[in-house]
């Protein structure tokens, strides 16, 4: 939790309380349903919460922004981002119902009114979004195929509407069909060794490819 406060010093008291509650909530749920790797649960704030918040170092979401989190799993990156940006709407989806039930319970416990969670495939989602976020659920070409018709036409941010993707390693081959993609090294923001090879990838997408 100290790392969150270090890198995001302007949190309100409510946000601090919400972030503090995450550990007990996920410890409790993980004992019932394995939504987070057993070896990672003790490093929840670094490997899941702070990792999710790396997106916020690239783009601060304006009020009224609509964000889709594809393959959210236990609620990452969506839940931490929803705490940080209470005036942004987040739609968290996954194909596994038990994970969505955990996300719904966590959002309810934190009283996150800006979160909707649903079991649904990305291809079947209705609506248009400013940004689509995810944590390495598949390779980028396949991911773009899932969500390419779900981007809003009007931009309200410095970054163009599109994908903000958390992934690591050498992405040269994976991104070769996306010349406007840009990689941001998370290690430039967070010093922990865990982030040494981790990146946020921004892929701008035109409306209705």
From Swiss-Prot:
<keyword id="KW-0808">Transferase</keyword>
<keyword id="KW-0949">S-adenosyl-L-methionine</keyword>
<keyword id="KW-0489">Methyltransferase</keyword>
<dbReference type="InterPro" id="IPR003682">
    <property type="entry name" value="rRNA_ssu_MeTfrase_G"/>
</dbReference>
<protein>
    <recommendedName>
        <fullName>Ribosomal RNA small subunit methyltransferase G</fullName>
        <ecNumber>2.1.1.-</ecNumber>
    </recommendedName>
</protein>
<dbReference type="InterPro" id="IPR029063">
    <property type="entry name" value="SAM-dependent_MTases_sf"/>
</dbReference>
<feature type="binding site">
    <location>
        <begin position="122"/>
        <end position="123"/>
    </location>
    <ligand>
        <name>S-adenosyl-L-methionine</name>
    </ligand>
</feature>
<feature type="binding site">
    <location>
        <position position="76"/>
    </location>
    <ligand>
        <name>S-adenosyl-L-methionine</name>
    </ligand>
</feature>
<dbReference type="GO" id="GO:0070043">
    <property type="term" value="F:rRNA (guanine-N7-)-methyltransferase activity"/>
</dbReference>
<feature type="binding site">
    <location>
        <position position="71"/>
    </location>
    <ligand>
        <name>S-adenosyl-L-methionine</name>
    </ligand>
</feature>
<keyword id="KW-0698">rRNA processing</keyword>
<comment type="function">
    <text>Specifically methylates the N7 position of a guanine in 16S rRNA.</text>
</comment>
<keyword id="KW-0963">Cytoplasm</keyword>
<feature type="binding site">
    <location>
        <position position="135"/>
    </location>
    <ligand>
        <name>S-adenosyl-L-methionine</name>
    </ligand>
</feature>
<comment type="similarity">
    <text>Belongs to the methyltransferase superfamily. RNA methyltransferase RsmG family.</text>
</comment>
<dbReference type="GO" id="GO:0005829">
    <property type="term" value="C:cytosol"/>
</dbReference>
<dbReference type="Pfam" id="PF02527">
    <property type="entry name" value="GidB"/>
</dbReference>
């Amino acid at each position: 939790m100290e790392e969150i406060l270090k890198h995001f010093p302007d949190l309100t008291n409510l946000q601090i309380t919400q972030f503090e509650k995450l550990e007990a909530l996920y410890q409790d749920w993980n004992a019932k349903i394995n939504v987070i790797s057993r070896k990672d649960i003790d490093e929840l704030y670094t490997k899941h919460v702070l990792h999710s918040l790396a997106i916020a170092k690239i783009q601060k979401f304006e009020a009224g922004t609509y964000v889709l989190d594809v393959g959210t799993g236990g609620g990452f990156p969506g839940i931490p981002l929803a705490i940080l940006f209470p005036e942004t709407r987040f739609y968290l989806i996954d194909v596994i119902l038990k994970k969505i039930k955990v996300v719904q319970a966590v959002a309810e416990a934190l009283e996150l009114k800006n979160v909707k969670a649903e079991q649904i495939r990305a291809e079947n989602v209705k609506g248009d979004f400013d940004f689509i976020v995810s944590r390495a659920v598949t390779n980028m070409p396949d991911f773009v195929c899932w969500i390419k018709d779900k981007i809003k036409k009007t931009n309200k941010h410095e970054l163009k509407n599109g994908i903000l993707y958390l992934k690591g390693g050498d992405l040269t081959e994976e991104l070769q069909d996306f010349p406007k993609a840009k990689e941001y090294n998370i290690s430039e923001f967070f010093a922990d060794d865990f982030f040494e090879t981790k990146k946020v990838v921004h892929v701008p997408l035109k409306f209705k490819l």
